[in-house]
Structures are given as structure tokens and as C-alpha cells.
């Protein structure tokens, strides 16, 4: 029997977020009706990951995160480690996060096309809006996505962040206008609607076309299954989820955050699932 697929989202106080994630998981189930697929959350919503892991004996945990930061490096392995400590017989593998990935970038381009932004229109300047993190490598990954989008279109593309990093969306819009962009569009590097995507909308101040979050797209559903299947081909280290690993995870995070002995959280959440 194949292990269950446990898709874990961050969780949000905004009900639109959980509704979107639930719709996304329905898409995944439609693609693989024979697979046991379950949804869990790290925070703010139920069921929590540790609760869901009490109901399975074997599972692949797929983080519904668009990049690596505090939630992927500390919160998630901590929750899994606690579940394994409580039930040592659990056979749990943690898959890689969803992004960055070319399939997500293609969805972001489609969302822009839906609001009338043509890849051939050099008059557009595009802001790629993401959550933001106190971890520089996470923000650099978003910047790399923006660079790839600019390479495959005729746009100027700059990254922007809703919190914890700069430039802000407002600053990015001003930069594009100063560089000669005649029209502005904002691409969403969020998986679902929520408070931080709403902050992006406010910062755009009615001056830009606003693309929707990636959402319950078929390509995102296929990517979730790709992450699940990848663990069965030996591409993901199993020791991520062992109880003794969590100390190493925290120490590594502390070093990256520049605060020895104390992990530093991102502002509200990270990588696409807003509170």
C-alpha cells in the first residue's frame, strides 16, 4: 500500500485561504483517485499536522510552500519530529517545498494573461509580489524568479515583498515607472488569497493591474503529485523527520538568521500561505 499524501499548508485566519487550498486538494484527488490524500495545517487552521499524523502509519508530507524559510526549515520539521517522537513506528518522509518551480512560474504568467498582460508588450513593468522573509536566500529565490520571468517576456520584472524585506510593492512600482514603464502589473507569488495578498493590493494603490494568486490550478496539483512521487524515487532524505533532527534544524536556522541560540520568525508567515 502506498503511503498517504499529507499536504500541509501554513494556515490562515482568512477563510478564503483554506477554501482555496481545499479546492486545490480536490484537484489533486481527481488526478490520483486511488491515493489517500489528506490536508493539514501548521497553524491557525485545523486539522493540525500533528493530529493528521496520528491517523496514518506511512505518509509523505508535501509542504504547500513556495520557498524555504522558517516554516519549511523549523516549524514543519518540528511538527513532524514531535509526531514521530510520540509514535516511533511512524514511517514519514518530508518532500521538498513546491517552489520555486517552472510550473509555478507558468501559472503566474497565466494569471497575468487573465488580466490582459501580454508577454509581448514591452510597455508593461511587472512587480512579482511575494510574502518576504528575514532569510536572505528566500528573498533571493524570489528575485531569481523575477529575473527568469523577464528573460521569457518583454517586460521589466522586479521583485517586491509584503513584509520583512524590501522593496515594498509601492517602491517597486515607483522603480518601474522611473525606468519608463507605461503600465504596471502585479504578479502574485502567493498560493492563496489572504491578508498579505490584500496588503499587496492596497500597496498597488489602484495604479496596477492585479493578477490573482496561483490558486487551485491543475499545474499546481500536478506539482504536488510530482513532489510526492519524487520521495519514492529516493530524492528526499528521510532523516529530516527524525526526532533528533530538530535540534540540528534549529541550530542551522539560528546561524542563517544571525541570532545564535534563538530562531527568528518571519513577519507573519512565509512563502505563499498568508495568515
Residue ranges and their predicted role:
Residues 1-275:
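Active-site-proximal alpha-helix that buttresses catalytic centers in soluble enzyme cores
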Amino acid at each position: 500500500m502506498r503511503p498517504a499524501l499529507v499536504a500541509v499548508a501554513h494556515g490562515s485566519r482568512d477563510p478564503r485561504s483554506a477554501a482555496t487550498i481545499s479546492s486545490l486538494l480536490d484537484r489533486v484527488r481527481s488526478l490520483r483517485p486511488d491515493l489517500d490524500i489528506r490536508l493539514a495545517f501548521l497553524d491557525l487552521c485545523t486539522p493540525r499536522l500533528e493530529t493528521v499524523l496520528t491517523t496514518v502509519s506511512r505518509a509523505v508530507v508535501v509542504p504547500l510552500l513556495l520557498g524555504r524559510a522558517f516554516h519549511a526549515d523549523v516549524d514543519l520539521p518540528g511538527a513532524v519530529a514531535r509526531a514521530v517522537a510520540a509514535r516511533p513506528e511512524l514511517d514519514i518522509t518530508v518532500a521538498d517545498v513546491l517552489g520555486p518551480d517552472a510550473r509555478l512560474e507558468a501559472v503566474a504568467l497565466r494569471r497575468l494573461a487573465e488580466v490582459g498582460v501580454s508577454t509581448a508588450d514591452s510597455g508593461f513593468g511587472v512587480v512579482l509580489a511575494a510574502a518576504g522573509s528575514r532569510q536572505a536566500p528566500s528573498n533571493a529565490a524570489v528575485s531569481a524568479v523575477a529575473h527568469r520571468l523577464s528573460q521569457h517576456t518583454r517586460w521589466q520584472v522586479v521583485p517586491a515583498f509584503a513584509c520583512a524585506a524590501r522593496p515594498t510593492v509601492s517602491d517597486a512600482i515607483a522603480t518601474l515607472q522611473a525606468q519608463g514603464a507605461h503600465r504596471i502589473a502585479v504578479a502574485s507569488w502567493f498560493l492563496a488569497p489572504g491578508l498579505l495578498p490584500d496588503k499587496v493590493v492596497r500597496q498597488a494603490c489602484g495604479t496596477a493591474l492585479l493578477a490573482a494568486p496561483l490558486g487551485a490550478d491543475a499545474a499546481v496539483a500536478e506539482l504536488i503529485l510530482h513532489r510526492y512521487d519524487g520521495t519514492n524515487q529516493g530524492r528526499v532524505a528521510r532523516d529530516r523527520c527524525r526526532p533528533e533532527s530538530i535540534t540540528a534544524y534549529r541550530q542551522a536556522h539560528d546561524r542563517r538568521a544571525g541570532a545564535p541560540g534563538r530562531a527568528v520568525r518571519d513577519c507573519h508567515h512565509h512563502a505563499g500561505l498568508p495568515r
